[in-house]
Every structure is written in structure tokens, then in C-alpha cells.
Amino acid sequence: MEEGITLATLDSHDCPVGSRMTSFISSDGPPGIEISLTKADSLEHGLRGLESGDIDVLAIPAGMIHGNMLGVLQAGCKIVGARTPVRPYPVLVSENKLQYQPKSAILLCESKLGRRQLRRARRGIRVLSPEAYADIEGRADTPSDPISLTKWMEELRESGDIDGFVVARGLYDKCQLVTRRHSLLPDGLNEGDPHFIPPAYSDLIVFVARSRFPKSISDEISEKEGETAWWVQNNFVGSLDAKS
């Protein structure tokens, strides 16, 4: 058994990093190292912990790294691995599948990519962002917190004002919704089902460590599929940023 490490986790509303790492350590059998888990309050807090040596690795949703890589590098750190996404696909929260929505249906979706895919898959229905819907209906500003926004949309669905909405699976679970959900998958379960691409970095966890962190240790917690997902998505999104 190698010397143990301290791994800090940082959750987002749609990526439960802490529970994922706890499950990995407990159910997959102990890796070749002893891992002690702790929590970070923010990316900045985690980077300070790495700089001071209080922690050895920071596990964080990949989406939090986007736009913050310079800060990671300035802290003398780098991405040393990633975990394969478990549930990256968003869900449609509605009594009906997308194909069976009435022609007058109103669906809400925050993601611009998601709205485009919904309109392509089911022409004729109204697919709006929560902000656009609130503006059209003359309602108060939408909640800024993802959990509050999800609950707000569920209240609209329950009252019959809308027919459904799309959220990350992690948000659905965190809000403890019991309404029927329909996963928007890249390959439909049944013939004729529409195909959807999940948003970049969905449910993807990356590991941040100091620049000279031993590869033999990062290999114990990282997965090749996760590393590939990170490399592909980060390079793709980075190329879009460079063109904008």
C-alpha cells in the first residue's frame, strides 16, 4: 500500500462529486492507495489547499474549469485525470414523452443547444428558455439558483401553465422530483426515438493536482474513458471559444 492522499471534492448542483467519489472508494474496492476525503468550498479554496499542501488532489466538475484554467496554471497545478460520466444525459420532466406532447405544448429548457435539439426533434411545439417564458407571460424574474429555478418550473408544470421542462439528471435528483422523467439519449431506446447530444462537460469529473503529482497515483483514481471525454470536450469547446 502506497502512502495515502487527501482528496477534496467540490460539488455543483448537477454533478455530485462527493457522493461519486465516496461510491468509487467504497464499492469498487480500495485502490492501491489510501484516500482520505474532505470537501472544498470553492475552486479558489481548493487551489489554495493544493498550493499549501493541505490536500493532494481536487475533484471538481469539469464545467467549473472552463474559463478558469489560467487560475489553475497560476497555482502551479494541472488536470491529472478524469472520471467517466455516469449520467450525462438531461431529462425531460413531463407526463408525456417528447413524441407524444400535444401540438400546443410549451417546454422550457435553459440550454440553447437543448432548445435547438428539441425543436428539431419535435417541430411545432413551443420551446422557450425560462427567461423568455417569464418575459412573455409578464411574470417576475426567474430564480437565479438552479435548484430554485427547477422547483419554479415544476410548479408551472403542476399548474398546467407548461407541459414540461428539461434539466440535468443531477438537478432532478437533488430536487427530489417524483414526476415522470424521460432521458434525452444520443441513441433512443426505441426505433424512431429522437437523438440528443448532452451539453459539454455533463457529469464529467476532473482531478486537479500540483504539476509534479505522480502519474502512478493519478492512474489509481482516473479512468481512460473519462480522460478521453475531457480531452475531446475541452478541445472542442476551446476551439469554439477561439473562434468567437
Language-model features: locations:
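Small-molecule-sensing regulatory modules
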Residues: M1-S52, R115-R116, R120-S244
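Small-molecule pocket liners
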Residues: G76-C77, V86-K97, H195, Y201-F207
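Flexible hinge/capping segments at coil-to-helix
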Residues: P90-L107, A121, I125
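Short coil/turn connectors at secondary-structure junctions
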Residues: G76, Q101-A105, I162
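Residues that line or immediately flank small-molecule/substrate-binding pockets and catalytic motifs
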Residues: A62, N96, R169
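Short beta-strand-centered segments that line the small-molecule binding cleft or hinge
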Residues: G46-Y89
